[in-house]
């Protein structure tokens, strides 16, 4: 079973992926996590990625696909994956279609206001990379490993609007691509919803596959 989680940054893709891993045994693959891993290691590819993300720009398709395909080929992905943050362009969707059968695309639809609120209150652990939402997690240290929490540069106000604009510019044709393939399911999220509220809708659809 291979699933794509689609939606703007801050819509809750990471939380939904965590639930799907727990309940269906899928491997969570986040392009953002893969990028940060490459950057942390300061590999040649990581330095290339860093030059884009540090200024709020999109990482080019060919670089993103190279990183992702290398991960999908690993043995632990044989039972199925949940892709978080990929594809982000129609070219990426078409390239993915050639190498991996996608069973379902779940698009989490949120307003700009929700994105601004959630990203503005999102913090990451410096030690293990776990993301915490200040609205739900009333803590000052990582609840997974006890590490220090910090706000990523691209979660700060000056970058959020640019990320939204980039997302909207490409996402319509991606949704059309999967809608035409009868693989698209849209979840309309609300600001007052907890991650568990949203996941109840997602789980019901996935369980029917």
Region locations from a protein language model:
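Hydrophobic positions on the alpha1 helix immediately C-terminal to the Walker A/P-loop
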Residues: 16
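NTP-dependent small-molecule kinase module
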Residues: 19, 148-209
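ATP-dependent small-molecule kinase phosphotransfer cores
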Residues: 27-101, 152
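Hydrophobic anchor at the beta1->P-loop junction of P-loop NTPases
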Residues: 3-5
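Conserved lysine of the Walker
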Residues: 13
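Cys/His-rich short segments
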Residues: 116-161
